[in-house]
């Protein structure tokens, strides 16, 4: 699929995310890899439910700079980190869902462990509900460079897959193309909803 087609697919995914209420108040950011050097990242302060292809800025993966001079999203450094860590990643979605935001605060360990859910198989490479699927949780930080370094350091010891949570902030996930990243987002959000309900019912 051409870059233009993939960017149109990403815009459609952004509209879907906006309709779900998963990126409220202009929150969240989305990107698409162009090649080894460049990616296209949503511009800061834009409502994700009404983005167009013109709202994506070309960004240098190595430097985080946008040649246009326009301001890319605040978490640019996390998107470019993922593209550097995962050559197979071609789309990154960062959302602020209620489930991801709350679960990342309730879970006090450094990972949310998912097991026993059939929908784990929505994640690439997962073939059984019996596996333990850890989703790493990192403390939120306004210093994105420092946060990116912590994530990279963690990945060197405990390789990341699919996505990670920022505590009290949201979910960042990725995939080999827009469709896979979107499936990972939808699958993880479903699993987070199940986990929220399970914890609430167990406390009742």
From Swiss-Prot:
Which Pfam family is an annotated match for this chain, by its short name? Aldolase_II
The Gene Ontology biological process annotation of the record reads: L-methionine salvage from methylthioadenosine; pentose catabolic process
Can you provide one Gene Ontology molecular function annotated for this UniProt record? Answer: methylthioribulose 1-phosphate dehydratase activity
Keyword Lyase in annotation: yes
Identify the cofactor(s).
Zn(2+)
What the record notes about the co-factor is:
Binds 1 zinc ion per subunit.
Q: Name the NCBIfam families on file.
A: PRK09220.1, salvage_mtnB
**So what does this one do?**
Catalyzes the dehydration of methylthioribulose-1-phosphate (MTRu-1-P) into 2,3-diketo-5-methylthiopentyl-1-phosphate (DK-MTP-1-P).
Q: What is this protein called?
A: Methylthioribulose-1-phosphate dehydratase
Q: What is the lineage of its organism?
A: Bacteria, Pseudomonadati, Pseudomonadota, Gammaproteobacteria, Enterobacterales
């Amino acid at each position: 699929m051409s870059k233009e087609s993939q960017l149109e697919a990403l815009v459609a995914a952004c509209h879907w995310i906006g309709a779900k209420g998963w990126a409220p108040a202009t929150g969240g950011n989305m990107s698409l890899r162009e090649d080894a050097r460049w990616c296209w990242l949503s511009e800061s302060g834009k409502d994700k439910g009404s983005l167009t292809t013109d709202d994506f800025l070309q960004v240098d993966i190595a430097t985080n700079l946008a040649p246009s001079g326009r301001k890319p999203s605040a978490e640019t450094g996390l998107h470019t980190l993922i593209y550097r860590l995962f050559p197979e990643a071609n789309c990154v979605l960062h959302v602020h869902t209620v489930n991801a935001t709350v679960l990342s605060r309730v879970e006090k360990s450094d990972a949310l462990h998912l097991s026993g859910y059939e929908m784990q198989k929505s994640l690439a490479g997962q073939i059984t509900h019996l596996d333990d699927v850890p989703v790493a949780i990192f403390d939120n930080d306004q210093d994105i460079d420092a946060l990116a370094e912590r994530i990279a350091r963690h990945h060197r010891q405990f390789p990341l897959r699919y996505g990670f949570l920022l505590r009290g902030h949201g979910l960042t996930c990725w995939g080999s193309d827009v469709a896979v990243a979107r499936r990972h987002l939808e699958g993880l959000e479903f699993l987070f909803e199940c986990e929220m309900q399970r914890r609430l019912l167990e406390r009742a």
